[in-house]
Amino acid sequence: MNDIKEMKLYSNAHRIFNDLKALGYAEEDELKLEDVNQFDQLHYHGTLSVQEAIESINIQENDNVLEVGAGWGGPSRYIAYKTRANVSALELQQDYSEVGKELTLKTGLESFVTHINEDFLNYSQKDTCFDKIVSWLALYHIPNRKKYTEKLFNLLNKKGMLFIEDLTFGSGFESSHKEMLEKKLFANSLEKYSDYLDTCANVGFEIVEHKDMSSDWESFTKERLKLLQT
């Protein structure tokens, strides 16, 4: 299996401090969440997508929420700020988890967000289950989709809810692409969109809503590329 650090997006966890410095922040300064949110959302549409999750699965004050593959914990902080839920930001990469914890302290949200540096496949929550679980562009990194989907189901309360944004195979996928996807995207459990839904349903999830975001994300990426090229 390839190392996740081979994926360029994850090569430098501390780069976010350079972005914040460019906004005028010094190393010792407290941070405004809205400024941090410009850089700490490692998924399409930033906090708009996180707000959609809050509304879609009705995240409320005092809910116990787990974010799987939290990166810097951007969505976790936004959820905590907007709802006053208690959020566990679970992240495999130690450097991202440590930087995320520092950002949480600097935004004054440490009472609501707990950063956990652990592999999701090894993670256990013995005392309580979660009311809500969320994840953005992270699950496809984890091997053995059936195993971790079952784990997601078992970590939720009986009336708990799950919100996922993730990658699936596109219509142009060929088996020869697999090695490239593993190396460039650390893709360890990609499957077709329909199979993804089946995997969730087969472990016990009731699928209330789903949407193929391929065309939307393609448009988003093209527009972002144009901005970077200007």
Stretches found by the model and what they are:
Residues 167-187:
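Short, glycine-/aromatic-enriched active-site segment of Class I SAM-dependent methyltransferases
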